[in-house]
Amino acid sequence: MKKIEAIIKPFKLDEVREALSEVGVTGLTVTEVKGFGRQKGHTELYRGAEYVVDFLPKVKIEAAVPDELVERTIEAIVKAARTGKIGDGK
């Protein structure tokens, strides 16, 4: 049994969940998180002042899977979550 964690873009959650279901993952924990990396944040205007928002909203998924499902689970997450743009991760 292995615990797999991935941080993905929020709009990819449904696709990842469906892909994991197809490979046999039956349980998943989802947490809303914020993070930053090479992908830069954005500026927002609040009460007439500009603020830089460095942390971007992400979703962390966690799943405990049997050893025989580890590779298929990772492949399913990567394939479903990838957008081809900055912020995809490694």
How would you label these PLM feature ranges?
Residues 1-90:
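Positively charged, small/polar-rich N-terminal and surface patches that mediate targeting and assembly
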